[in-house]
């Protein structure tokens, strides 16, 4: 018979208890891990909601603000500079409400090539939020992703660009999980889906009862950015909005990728029923020397309807697109380009529906939808013009 002293027995018991407690804590830690599959189909695991975040595109502030509208910048330790340079109107709104936005370190400019891994690692980030594709690092930047994850920075991919009407909901739910804001994410998703149904369901009913001609649409992207006529979107981005409302995108059969060029001769031959331009100009462009400014269409934060209309008139005049039948017949419209990269895109979908099928959607009010999105889910007020119809009478005066 083996005898064990009381002292050794106590040590043994303590060891066993410690071992068991370690196992319990390990199991609890495992159970509390946040585990999701991102939109690059990668398994992403966090031990706790992210507290130090890198934004691969600072335009994702729209999404983060939905989850934390009172303090959207609190956990952001670094971001690309795209919002300030590409959408200065919105940046100025944030700057006025949250002056500390200027103090957030920039980890790059407006491209993946400018993204600084070294800068990110110096900021002790625990999560980097990237788009599957876009201005910042994407899913194809395997080496960069590997560098970050080896250094302990978890990478999460979201998407408002490639398949926006499917992936906006998925992206917001992912962000809700990793940031510990599921309730806010669910509230947004509920509103978003209800507003999408206001397009999808009436359109399906109308098509079933009275099959109608799908309008041929030319989607003119980033008007004024280059002299060459005319950049367009064929797949994803705003082309996906067009697909969702049953529009016939005339670029789809001519452009093999997501974006490309259709020349003016082709447009004059095909003569789309509807012309939609995307506007990359901002209020700040109006403050500069107009004579030296490209013919941007100006829309977005801080832009009046009259200024938007004047910029649209100028862009049409300088591009020679006034000869399009759609323009002459009063079926020419412009919309804020950056809808394609934010979860506020549902307002743009409703606008497209109303432009293509005005009778079916006579009672739909996209402006009210956008107002609600800002009132419920954004930290800054809706203040500006985000779409406009070309005033053909003004053009002939």
Residue map of PLM features:
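Bacterial N-terminal signal peptides
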Residues: 11-23
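Bacterial N-terminal signal peptides that target proteins for export
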Residues: 2-14
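A general, composition-driven signal for non-globular sequence regions
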Residues: 1-5, 19-22, 266
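N-terminal ligand-binding lobe of clamshell/alpha-beta domains
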Residues: 27-397
